[in-house]
Structures are given as structure tokens and as C-alpha cells.
Amino acid sequence: WTPEQPNLYALLLSVNNQKQTVDTKYERFGWREWTLQGTTQYLNGEPYALHGDSWHFMGIPQMTRRYAWAWFTAIKGMNANAVRPHAQVYPRFYLDMADEMGICVLNETANWASDGGPKLDSDLFWEASKEHLKRFVLRDRNHASVFGWSISNENKPVILHVYNRPELMPVQKKAWEEWRDIVHQYDPTRPWISADGEDDGDGILPVTVGHYGDINSMKRWIEIGKPWGIGEHSMAYYGTPEQVAKYNGERAYESQEGRMEGLANECYNLIVNQRQMGASYSTVFNMAWYALKPLPLGKKDKSKAPTVEADGVFFGDYKEGVPGVQPERVGPYCTT
């Protein structure tokens, strides 16, 4: 299995009792091996750099295999081969589609804190996080597309710079050790264990992954001496026209398209720098949400502003007692 040739196989197990089949289990898998040597990641014995996208699952518009297919098709179309499902457990079909389409997945837990998040001063959180990670690894470890595990996202910067609680860092360091060991126990086949936006977990983890920063930040990540990557980069989600104007001047103020042109300039240079400096995983944050044009779902007359009553994709009436989510409507332009 490689992104270029995502060959898959099936294991079919049957339990028989007195010549009668009483249970059957089907498991799909792919043959491949990821290894780390020095500062480089290898796939099937060859150096292999990953170029990915990332986004945070938003809900109903993303709850179809077709959305996963569209996202991964866009990733392939931008000459990339990887994805990080950001900060939560995604539906299984995302990994199924990645297996089939040749997308390498940095599988990330829900142990994240970006600008708020979990109650990091509660023992209950830290205990629950271990069971969560165990179940997460057991669920997804047979997917060929999963190349590594991201065990947390931005916990450290939130502890230090949002909560201003440096006394919580010993607890976080202990958790990194426990989370790393849980991954080793339940999946000894994947050496990539990282914490997105937290460097190498103060030396605890085998891989370094940073967020944002500049050339000096990348030099610092390289100096750690491990395979390294960037999980989030660019100012796409926060850059004001004033900030973007450093790339394309007053054009950044004229329209959203002008702003995006400036961001494209920034992102191009960031990606060039990441590649030239030998990142094992390079990305900007992100293509799916900020760089793709949203689709006018269920809207025929695009000359008028959409309304809740007339536009969108409408579903059937709510049925009491039926399990699962029952959406009422998916609105135009909600896919990106």
C-alpha cells in the first residue's frame, strides 16, 4: 500500500460450530511499513515526505462518504497526499475512504485544548483521556492509511499562555508519557507519535510537530534532531487585510478574493520553506475551509441571497424514537 498504489486486501474470519457458521468477521487492510531513521520518515524502506491538509469536523455537511471523497480528491489535486482530522474522532468512513484513495492519515485524538477546551486541572480529564486514546487506537489501527498518532493538540501553549497555569505542566508531561506508552502497547507498528503544536512534548515524543512560527521556529524544530513537521501554518483563519497586505498591498483590502490572493502568496512561500528545510510533514491551515469555493447546495438562483425557508437541501420530518442524527436542512455554502 502506498498513496500512489493503495492496494487493499481482506481478512475473512468465520467461527463454526458443528459445521454451522455462527459468526463472521471481515477486516480490510493493506501491507506497508512506516519507519523513522534519524530525521527522516520512510515508507516501505524509501524516504517519504507527506504534504497534507487539516480541518475540524463541523457536523452534518461532512457526514457523508461523498464529502470525504471530495476533500481527499481536492488534496490529491493540490499535489498532496496526507490529512490530519483535527482534534476529534472522525466517522470511520473517512479512514475507509483514505484507505481506498491513498491518503495518509495523521490520526488525532480529542485530547486538545486550543484556547479553552478541557478542564485540565481535573483528575477526571486525565484519567478519561487514557481510556479515550486506548479505544481510539484499537478502533483505527488496522487502517492502512493511518501513518501515525497525534496524541494531543496545543495543550501546552494553552496551559502556559491561555490559562497561565505553568504548575499544570508536570501533569501534562506525565500524560504525554502515558499516552505514548498506550500507543506503543496497542499499536507497536507505527513509530510516529506526535503532539500537534507542542514540539516533541518536552523531549518525550519521537517526532517534533510545530504550529505557525517563522524560519527561526523551523530551525529550532530541526535542531531538536528528530523527524519534524508542521501541523498548522499561515494566517488564513486570522489574518486581517492589514496583515495580508504585506504580501499584495492594497489588493488585500479590496475584496475577499484580494485577501485570498495575498494568502496564496504567503502559503506558497511557507510550503517552499518547509520542503527546502526537510519537513517530513508539511501543511498550511488550511485548504478545505479557506481555499475552496463553497458550493451553493440546494440554491438555484444565485443572484439572490439565500433564505432559510427556500434554499438548501431539506430532509424529511423528524421521527420520534429513531436512532441517529436527523437533520432538518443543509444550507447553501456550508461545505467549506
What do these predicted ranges mean?
Residues Q88, A110, S152-K156, P188, ...:
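Catalytic metal-binding/acid-base residues of hydrolase active sites
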Residues E100, S122-P206, G225:
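Active-site neighborhood of glycoside hydrolase catalytic domains
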Residues P91-F93, S114-D115, N155-I159, D200-D202, ...:
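Flexible loop/turn segments at secondary-structure boundaries
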Residues F147-W149, Q172, W176, D181-H184, ...:
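Substrate-binding clefts and catalytic carboxylate motifs of secreted carbohydrate-active enzymes
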Residues T35-T39, Y90-F93, W126-L138, E198, ...:
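Alpha-helical scaffolding within the catalytic cores
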Residues S114-D121, D202-I204, S217-W221, Y238-T240:
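Short, charged, surface-exposed secondary-structure boundary motifs
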Residues T2-P3, S54-R66, A74-H86, E108-A128, ...:
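The substrate-binding groove and active-site-proximal loops of carbohydrate-active enzymes
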Residues W1-R92, M97, M101-V105, H132, ...:
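Secreted/periplasmic carbohydrate-active enzymes, especially glycoside hydrolases
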